A protein has these predicted regions:
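Terminal, low-structured helical/coil segments at or just beyond the last alpha-helical repeat
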Residues: 28, 167, 216-251
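Helix-start (N-cap) detector for alpha-helical repeat units in TPR-like alpha-solenoids
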Residues: 28-30, 63-64, 97-98, 131-133, ...
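Canonical tetratricopeptide repeat
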Residues: 34, 68, 75, 102, ...
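Register position in tetratricopeptide repeats
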Residues: 41-42, 75-76, 109-110, 145, ...
């Protein structure tokens, strides 16, 4: 009898564990996951975490739950926990491009440029990744931060080729402008800064870079217009303050 009880007790954890994979458990996990995602979209990251942690109890092996846990932790400023969750998501789904991309962004935040680039490359290795322009843009910025301008330009140009109408288009052209500016190719820098501000006039950092580049070629009239745009869209920011200083220096 005692042997039977011991056998049953040893088997119970297996039974209980397997029960968490039932359709009912998956349905419950989806309910909490859906609530968590909605709360993330509303910017309520703490409440989102509560829902997602409940979802994890019902389906701990769902990579999507860990992915959104990572996003919620980012929203709360808990970077290390976010890294752990994205790694869990990837361990459960190796070709999870979105998780690789987010992990790369976190590595960039830590200035781990090579690690970030490796994650973006893994994201891009997935042929059915829906938004490759995001990882290409991020990869370009990581290369730029390393002062590897050749690869930075290649990645940004690929982003434009893959998705010319991307929501990131103004940012991509701004970054290409910065690459050319650092290489003293002022005409190309101005061209790309102009594209960026034409697509998004409120992109005030690009407006400032444009104005400063115009100053380098002594085009004070266009520089003045660019600085005035910075002040219009972001008067109290560091960019706005710098634009005011430039305007005061222009005679």
């Amino acid at each position: 009898m005692n042997k039977l009880i011991i056998t049953v007790l040893l088997c119970c954890p297996i039974i209980f564990f397997s029960c968490t994979n039932t359709p009912w458990h998956k349905e419950q996990a989806e309910v909490f996951l859906s609530k968590g995602v909605s709360l993330i979209e509303a910017g309520q990251f703490n409440n989102a975490l509560k829902e997602l942690m409940e979802a994890e109890k019902y389906s701990s092996g769902d990579p999507k739950i860990h992915y959104y846990l990572g996003i919620a932790y980012i929203g709360k400023g808990l970077r290390d926990k976010a890294v752990d969750e994205f790694k869990k998501a990837i361990s459960l789904k190796e070709n999870y491009s979105e998780a690789h991309n987010y992990l790369g962004v976190l590595y960039m935040d830590m200035e781990l440029w090579d690690e970030a680039i490796a994650e973006f490359d893994k994201a891009l290795a997935n042929d059915i990744y829906d938004t490759p322009s995001f990882s290409l843009y991020n990869s370009g910025w990581a290369y730029y931060s390393k002062k590897d301008y050749q690869h930075a330009l290649i990645q940004n140009q690929k982003a434009l080729q893959r998705d010319p109408g991307a929501i990131l288009r103004p940012q991509i052209d701004k970054n290409i402008g910065l690459i050319y500016l650092d290489q003293a190719n002022l005409s190309e820098a101005i061209r790309h800064f102009n594209i960026a501000v034409e697509l998004s006039p409120s992109l005030y950092d690009a407006q400032l870079f444009l104005g400063e580049t115009y100053l380098k070629i002594q085009d004070k009239a266009n520089a003045k217009k660019a600085f005035q745009a910075v002040i219009k869209y972001s008067p109290q920011s560091a960019y706005g303050i710098k634009a005011k200083e430039h305007l005061q220096s222009i005679k």
